[in-house]
């Protein structure tokens, strides 16, 4: 018996694994995939209502149900946050407020008055992000002249020129290109009400930026505003046509753009403004696709910002094999078959920097052939390497080849592109909505290392360089930054197992420092948690309410490092004692990251797959 079995009486780690495994198997679709809800914030729902209002396709039932969901997420002080139990967020609150006004909520209603008071106290509409002011400009409640300009002529910049569209991360370029169209057309379709209550009765001081690149970009923006008033007509027409062609070429089979909300919504707006009617097949596919991202339940109507079936499926496969499911189990064979069919076999934007690299990656979503990513591909390779399927081996080989070709110059790996590191993009006045480049990250690089190690490539130059990158990326306190998960717990939980798999000995200082950091940040209740505020405030690193997924990440690192002491036993006990009767765990806190500091995700399957992996490896003694 383990210590956990001795001290928990009727509930053991083995019991928890069995219950979680059975629950996960029940969630598999007949086709073989898994997909949990991808929960974000109410800007998705607010902007959906704004889109439909602008296009003239408002549905009263949908509006009422979306408003009900938005109200259900409002905090007692009248604000909305970007993640559960997070601080108020101004732009999110403004967009939610405007959406509720569209739904008929009176400005003098108590919940609206509280929201408006907060908004005014934070500087009002003038202090919001560019996206929010874009929406308000389209509805006549903000001046287009007061927005930064990114003209569609951007499409003419050659690929070697700074700030060409491929200098931006894939999610940013997909959003910026359609917004260049919207900003050039400058539509105004006034709302049926004013928003005076969202403006303070004083001038909001603007930050003074007069030196270096900031001053240069301010001057550039002034020049672009002058050009915007009198653009060269032939050049502008050609630029808009090129932008439209670029957008149309990237629409996916399901009607989406990149399988994510921002470029999807703005692409629909851009094409509509260029004359594509609501009955045009491209627009119709886009609108129909949004319906498939809609969830309706007792709380109302809400929109997923994205869907994660490939990611969820391979994490589920890895969890089930960690939990002892045989490699030839029908559920795993069915999942492997579905994953293999999802391989992206054509070129995408990644080909711009890697034109000679044959395709062979996987995307995050059901349909996203333009943008496979290294992180999903690494987890696919790990998952397929563990199961029995007649078509797995050639798919794995293509995935390994594609991953290897996506390495950046410094030996690390970004998510969607190689060497997407031009930090100048971050300085554009337009780019205040989150991360806009895709440099190598510790978690993605670690997953590649782990995948390659599973393929007996630990001694390859590629893996050695990646390991070297990870060693340099370790924080002075022993942790690693988490780009795609919250935050240092995720980064450390990803890197330590990868380094061990690559042959780094557990007694090495890099591993001992990581173990010490995790042990120092274990909470009194035995779990681990890290609040998303750690992305803006380093004092939160490793601190926050214990969650099932973050406790599992810490355990995965400690177990890989060979730890078997009290810290591990307390973490396992935390998971065993807090498991629900149905085999899963509660997790209201968001532990996924879209843009550090700006956009976060609650992956509803994380609370099941990662604890199952951790407990399964614990029982195996590894």
Regions found by a protein language model. Give the residues of each.
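Preference for long, amphipathic alpha-helical scaffolds in soluble/luminal domains
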Residues: 1-622
């Amino acid at each position: 018996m383990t210590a956990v079995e001795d001290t928990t009486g009727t509930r053991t780690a083995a019991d928890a694994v069995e219950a979680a495994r059975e629950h996960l198997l029940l969630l598999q679709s007949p086709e073989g995939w898994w997909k949990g809800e991808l929960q974000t914030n109410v800007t998705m729902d607010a902007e959906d209502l704004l889109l439909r209002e602008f296009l003239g396709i408002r549905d009263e039932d949908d509006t009422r149900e979306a408003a009900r969901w938005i109200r259900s997420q409002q905090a007692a002080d009248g604000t909305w946050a970007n993640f559960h139990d997070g601080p108020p967020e101004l732009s999110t609150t403004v967009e939610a407020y405007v959406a509720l006004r569209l739904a008929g909520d009176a400005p003098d209603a108590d919940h609206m008055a509280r929201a408006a008071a907060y908004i005014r106290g934070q500087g009002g509409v003038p202090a919001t992000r560019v996206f929010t002011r874009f929406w308000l400009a389209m509805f006549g409640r903000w001046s287009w002249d007061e927005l930064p300009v990114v003209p569609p002529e951007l499409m003419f910049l050659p690929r070697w020129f700074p700030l060409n569209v491929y200098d931006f991360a894939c999610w940013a370029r997909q959003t910026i290109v359609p917004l260049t169209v919207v900003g050039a057309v400058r539509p105004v379709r006034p709302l049926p009400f004013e928003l005076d209550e969202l403006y303070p009765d004083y001038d909001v001081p603007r930050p003074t930026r007069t030196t270096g690149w900031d001053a240069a970009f301010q001057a550039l923006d002034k020049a672009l505003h002058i050009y915007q008033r009198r653009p060269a007509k032939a050049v502008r027409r050609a630029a808009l046509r090129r932008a439209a062609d670029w957008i149309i070429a990237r629409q996916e089979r399901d009607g989406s753009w990149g399988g994510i909300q921002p470029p999807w919504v703005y692409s629909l707006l851009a094409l509509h403004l260029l004359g594509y009617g609501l009955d045009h097949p491209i627009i119709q596919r886009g609108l129909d696709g949004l319906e498939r991202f809609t969830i309706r339940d007792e709380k109302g109507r809400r929109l997923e910002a994205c869907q994660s079936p490939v990611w969820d499926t391979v994490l589920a496969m890895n969890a089930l094999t960690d939990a002892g499911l045989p490699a030839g189990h029908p559920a795993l064979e069915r999942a492997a078959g579905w994953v293999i069919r999802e391989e992206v076999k054509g070129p995408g934007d990644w080909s711009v920097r890697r034109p000679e690299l044959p395709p062979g990656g996987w995307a995050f979503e059901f349909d996203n052939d333009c943008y496979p990513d290294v992180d999903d591909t690494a987890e696919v390779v790990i998952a397929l390497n563990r199961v029995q399927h007649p078509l797995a081996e050639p798919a794995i080989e293509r995935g390994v080849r594609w991953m290897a070709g996506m390495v950046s110059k410094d030996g690390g790996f970004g998510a969607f592109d190689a060497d997407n590191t031009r930090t100048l993009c971050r300085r554009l006045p337009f780019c205040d909505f989150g991360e806009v480049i895709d440099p190598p990250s510790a978690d993605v690089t670690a997953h590649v290392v782990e995948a390659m190690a599973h393929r007996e490539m630990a001694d390859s130059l590629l893996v050695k360089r990646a390991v070297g990158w990870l060693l340099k990326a370790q924080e002075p306190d022993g942790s690693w930054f988490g780009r795609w998960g919250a935050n240092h717990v995720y980064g450390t939980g990803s890197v330590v197992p990868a380094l061990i798999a690559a042959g780094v000995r557990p007694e090495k200082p890099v591993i001992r420092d990581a173990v010490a950091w995790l042990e120092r940040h274990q909470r009194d209740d035995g779990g681990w948690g890290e609040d998303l505020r750690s992305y803006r405030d380093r004092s939160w690193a490793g601190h926050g309410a214990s969650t099932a997924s973050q406790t599992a990440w810490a355990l995965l690192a400690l177990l890989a490092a060979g730890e078997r002491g009290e810290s591990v036993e307390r973490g396992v006990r935390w998971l065993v004692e807090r498991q629900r009767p149905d085999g899963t765990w509660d997790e209201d806190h968001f532990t996924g990251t879209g843009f550090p500091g700006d956009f976060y995700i609650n992956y509803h399957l994380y609370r099941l797959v990662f604890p199952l992996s951790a407990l399964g490896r614990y029982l195996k003694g590894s």
